[in-house]
Regions:
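Helix-to-loop junctions at the C-terminal end of transmembrane segments
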Residues: 73-84, 272-285, 369
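Helix-loop-helix hairpin linking two adjacent transmembrane segments in secondary transporters
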Residues: 111, 141, 148-195
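Juxtamembrane intracellular "pre-TM" segments in multi-pass secondary transporters
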Residues: 8-16, 195-228
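Intracellular juxtamembrane helix-capping segments at the cytosolic ends
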Residues: 125-137, 326-339
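Structural signature of the two symmetry-related core transmembrane helices
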Residues: 87-101, 287-302, 382
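C-terminal transmembrane helical hairpin of 12-TM major facilitator-type secondary transporters
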Residues: 286-331
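Conserved MFS/SLC helix-loop-helix module at the cytosolic interface between two early adjacent transmembrane helices
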Residues: 71-109
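Cytoplasmic helix-loop-helix junction between adjacent transmembrane helices
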Residues: 115-152
Length: 399
């Protein structure tokens, strides 16, 4: 069976445990849902002319999707501390299915941009699933469970691009959106049947709930600091994964298929998630954070060296992905421990900062590359995790 606990008591705030199969299913769901944000990234140049969007505005597709996701994190994810979680997951996933289907059908550039924003807005179910799993997992294994599920999220981010590139060769770009819509419908159906229920005990109006998100951000310095560290790291992650394919195709003779293989190799970095979970459970969160914040700028600087070939880009991809995932899970574990009854809102603050960083990174990537080329751009990208490292070392007493 997918789960041994299909229903959790409506006032359950105590962990009841998750089967290994359920953890694997949640990891798959996280990866599949978050992939919606990135399917368009490698194929925007195919989409834009067919819907009448200028090449100068093509990057808006990706940016609006990520900003929509950040908006959903801030305005929709906190509902998981107020409403029954399974119903929210099913509702948002079905809404994502509809918006993806409409995006595949539309021929209007303005409508496609609106739908891009809505795809991001409705793909927030992943950020309800993660704190739900944290609620259900026992304290002793919570880091491991969250780490395993977050590995699915990072794999979804990394594999969505090569998958999109491969699907577009067979089905065209509209087929990519139709396939994603069908997958969301299937996930909604399975979660409606198999996902454990959780009805929070927190009572408040929606306005008070959203206001409390900002109250939590003010109350917990650890939340602000962890959000800033990971936001800077994810901005560098987004910049790298936007810039590297351009560099590889322009100066290293890579084809779209080669870039897809490059992304697949980079996905090896997802092994950091379960490692991070075990480190957190063992009380080594600070050491793991230091390793992550050191690893990211060093990897980027090696890739920025004059004369560095594509091999260094591959190494950088693996190490950067490892560092980003390691720090994300360690930070998430620490943030969740601040207030067990507010995990969805804490997660909203944490993940909003991350994906705002990612959206800004993807927005400035192309202008940065066109003005400064690969080597100077890579140095600039390395400054972001270096700044996070400096902030971490200066506040050692807090985090």
């Amino acid at each position: 069976m997918l789960t041994g606990n299909p229903v959790v008591a409506t006032n359950a705030e105590q962990p009841v445990g998750l089967s290994g199969l359920m953890v694997a299913f949640l990891a798959f769901c996280c990866g599949a849902v978050v992939a919606n944000l990135y399917y368009a990234q490698p194929i925007v140049e195919l989409i834009a002319p067919q819907i009448g969007l200028s090449s100068a505005n093509a990057s808006l597709i990706v940016s609006l999707t990520q900003f929509g996701y950040a908006l959903g994190l801030l305005l929709l994810v906190p509902l998981a501390d107020l409403m029954e979680n399974r119903r929210l997951v099913v509702g948002f996933t079905l809404a994502a299915s509809v918006t993806l289907l409409c995006a595949g059908l539309t021929h209007s550039p303005s409508m496609f941009l609106v739908l891009s924003l809505l795809i991001g807005l409705t793909s927030v179910a992943v950020q309800i699933l993660v704190p739900l799993a944290a609620h259900l997992a026992p304290e002793a294994s919570r880091g491991r469970v969250v780490g395993n599920i977050m590995s699915g999220l990072l794999l979804g981010i990394l594999l969505s691009r090569p998958l999109s590139s491969l699907l577009v060769e067979v089905f065209g770009w509209r087929g990519v959106f139709y396939s994603a819509a069908a997958l969301m419908a299937v996930i909604a159906l399975i979660t409606a049947v198999a996902l454990p229920r959780r009805l929070p005990t927190h009572k408040a109006t929606y306005a008070a709930l959203i206001g409390s998100v900002f109250t939590l951000a003010r109350r917990y310095p650890v939340l602000r600091q962890r959000s800033l560290y990971q936001g800077l790291l994810f901005a560098s992650f987004s910049l790298f994964w936007t810039l590297a394919p351009i560099e590889l195709m322009r100066h290293h003779g890579f084809t779209q298929t080669h870039v897809a293989i490059f992304a697949l190799v980079g996905a090896v970095g997802a092994i950091a998630a379960p490692i991070a979970g075990r480190l957190a459970d063992a009380g080594h969160g600070r050491r793991g954070t230091l390793v992550a914040l050191l690893l990211a700028p060093v990897a980027l600087l090696f890739a920025a060296l004059p004369g560095s070939g594509y091999v260094w880009l591959v190494v950088c991809a693996v190490l950067l992905d490892f560092a980003v995932q390691l720090n994300m899970v360690l930070g998430q574990r620490e943030v969740y421990a601040l207030d067990p009854h507010s995990r969805a809102r804490l997660n909203a603050v944490y993940m909003t900062s991350i994906f705002v960083g990612g959206a800004v990174g993807s927005l400035v990537a192309s202008p940065l590359y066109e003005h400064f080329g690969w080597h100077l751009s890579a140095v600039a990208v390395a400054l972001l995790p270096a700044l996070a490292l400096g902030l971490f070392l200066s506040r050692r007493a807090d985090v």
